[in-house]
């Protein structure tokens, strides 16, 4: 099956005027994802996740925040020396000691961040904008003088005056030739329209690649990330299973599949998404919700009779993309909403064949059982019902066996 047969392309994009995407992914699961309350990854776990991200074709991996602890620093360094194709990045405050730690870790990119919003300047730093920007410039100069590529990140950018961001970014671009400037929607206040405006304004003001880092406090992190890409953002930040501070970050699995379906970007190995999701779920102790896009338990689970009957003929009738595209599996469930045609297809798929009268009897048993138990039935339960129906439909004068589950 060709790539194009695995999903339905959003052909309405052909009528939308947007800038062709020039993007790369920076996955921040190992740093921002680990800031999820209660989550601590071991060295072996971080190495395993980094290896999977690299094998998928993720361009940049943010491995951690070296000054957090000696163990963190050791892990970041080990990841940086694995020989991955992915470039390795780490976080740094606008402090010389943090940059020294990054240098000792052998990373490719250091992300030096400050906040420039009035909120953070007043209540977090208790310092002026000039002071904080001066600290950032000193750290950036020190990093570039020592051969590091630099991403200058504006924390809380979405609550910072746009003209202030433009001025700061232009200054570091002109003075230090940084590789990236980054916009962080730290509290998830943006929507796709305001994201497009913010990124477009910065795009018109600088020649440096723009990064977008979205949080999901209003459930729009993935949509905002795509809006940023359309407006000219180069580097898109994600986490596996959307884990992260508070409500989490833009979801890697959602962003990669959306890039394929919406924009035809197919270079990432999306077949690893489900196994990577399961890995991070195991390591973090956080299971994605059952209706989570792409990797949730119900993402490819169908019960409605109309849906199942159509899927048995052509899965794309009710699936935007096939489960195989993301390493998942389809699950056809027998329940209250299952119709005869769908039920016949399901029982045939598990090796049973029923006459019309038997099928009618089975559908009635299925509906009674599911309504009594308030849930769908398992395959074992279905097979038991099939056996009961076959026994009851035998031409015999014996009393019909009462069915039970």
UniProtKB/Swiss-Prot annotation:
It catalyses: acetyl-CoA + 2-oxoglutarate + H2O = (2R)-homocitrate + CoA + H(+); 2-oxoadipate + acetyl-CoA + H2O = (R)-dihomocitrate + CoA + H(+); 2-oxoheptanedioate + acetyl-CoA + H2O = (R)-trihomocitrate + CoA + H(+). It holds the Pfam family HMGL-like. InterPro entries: AIPM/Hcit_synth_CS, Aldolase_TIM, LeuA/HCS_post-cat, PYR_CT. Pathway: Organic acid metabolism; 2-oxosuberate biosynthesis. One of its GO terms (biological process) is carboxylic acid metabolic process. Keywords: Transferase. Catalyzes the condensation of alpha-ketoglutarate and acetyl-CoA to form (R)-homocitrate. Can also catalyze the condensation of alpha-ketoadipate with acetyl-CoA to form (R)-homo(2)citrate, and the condensation of alpha-ketopimelate with acetyl-CoA to form (R)-homo(3)citrate. These reactions are part of the biosynthesis pathway of coenzyme B and biotin. This is Homocitrate synthase AksA. It comes from Methanosarcina mazei (strain ATCC BAA-159 / DSM 3647 / Goe1 / Go1 / JCM 11833 / OCM 88).
